[in-house]
Each structure stands twice: as structure tokens, then as C-alpha cells.
Amino acid sequence: MDGFASDTAPIVKDNFKSSWQAEQPLVIIADTKILAAAPTELKSSGFGDMVAKYIGLAEWKMANLLIDEYYCPKIAAITSEAIDRITALADRITENSEEAAGAVMEALVLTGLAMKLAGCSRPASGAEHVVSHYLECYKLNRGIWPEFHGKKVGVMTVILNRAYRNIAERVTEVNPHADNTDWDLVYSKYDACMLNDIKRVNTPTITDKVSPEKLKESWGEIRKIILETLPTDEKLLSLMHA
């Protein structure tokens, strides 16, 4: 879990998941023999949480381009190299392999450190985590087991990766306008007990800082970021099925 090495903690309070400030640990100890013998579903979940970083890295670059959000190539490289290492071992993740289990653990710890260095969660999560958290809250409020975190973000990574690449491949020009999202409709999809928290974390909204003119001007570069950072659908599915 990348959260082990970061200085924030995703905590569920009253069935609502949000990030809280925490202290970064001085030492993290993991026994690869124990990790290798863990249930297959848990190891797959760790792998799913790592491939999700593709989305976070792409969105971080886009945020830097569109709203001048802080971006550090060296920090991004920590996550990118961690992804490369575990995807090279994809076909061994579910085996009783200390090397593969250790690689997943190390990769998650490194991305946690990347979050600390960046001062934000961009190096480790993106829209796939947001949707996963929504699903988790939705299920918790209905007394349903929400599934493992990495399993949810892994599935959402496939869906969002496909959506991003489809847009980048098919849409060559855009004519943006100011955001006119029907936020009342958005809020209606959340349980009443979560509304205050949802409004709090969405004020200001995610699009308030995005200039339509800047989006239009940067569209070519955005497409390039998506197509160069995100894997093809075939590659991603191959990794997930390995």
C-alpha cells in the first residue's frame, strides 16, 4: 500500500473516505516470504494499485500544462520506474515469488515516497481512485463489502485508460466553453449523509481553474501526453490478465 510511506492517510469516517494529514513513518519493514505467501487476490490488488499510477502520471502532466500545477519530472520518474519494474514481472505476481512480491511492495512504498516529495497525491493516484472511493462509499452506506482497494482502482484504470485514449485518438480539435456541469444532478447521485463532505471537497470545483482558451490551445499537447503516457488497451489488459 503506497499510503504506508506517505504523510497522508485515507480514512473512512461515517462511511465517507477522505485523506487526513499523518506522520510519515521512519522505517517500513516487510517480509517478502510472508508477502509471497499471501492470498492471490491480495497480491493482485497490490498490482492493480500500481498499474493505476499510469492515470495519475498522465493527469499530473495535464494539470501542469493547463493550470500550471507543480510538476517534477524526477518525482514522476520514481513512479514510472516502479511501474516498469512490476509490469516486467506481471506474469509472476500471483506466484509464490519473493522477487515479485518484493517488487510490488517496493513499488508501492516508492510511490508513497513520491507523494511525500511532491506534496500531493498526483504521483500515485488520479480519477481512477476518485471513482473507486465513490464506489467504496456507496457500498459502505448499504452494508456491502466494498472489495479490495487495488481491485477497484485496477478495474477503473482499465475503463478510464480506454476513455482517455479513445478521446485522444478520435478528437483532433476541441471548442471548449466554460463549465456548465449540473452539480445538483451530480450531488443527487450521492447519499444524503455524504452531501456536505462531497460539496466541501468539490469547492471550488475541479474545472474552476481551467481556461477554455488554454484548453483549446493545449489540446494537441494533451493528446500527446495521453498517447505517450497511457498504455494501449491491449497492453493494459494483457498485464491485468498475466
Where are these predicted regions, by residue range?
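A glycine/threonine-rich phosphate-anchoring loop and its flanking beta-alpha core
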Residues: 1-82
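Active-site segments that bind and position negatively charged phosphate/pyrophosphate groups
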Residues: 77-238
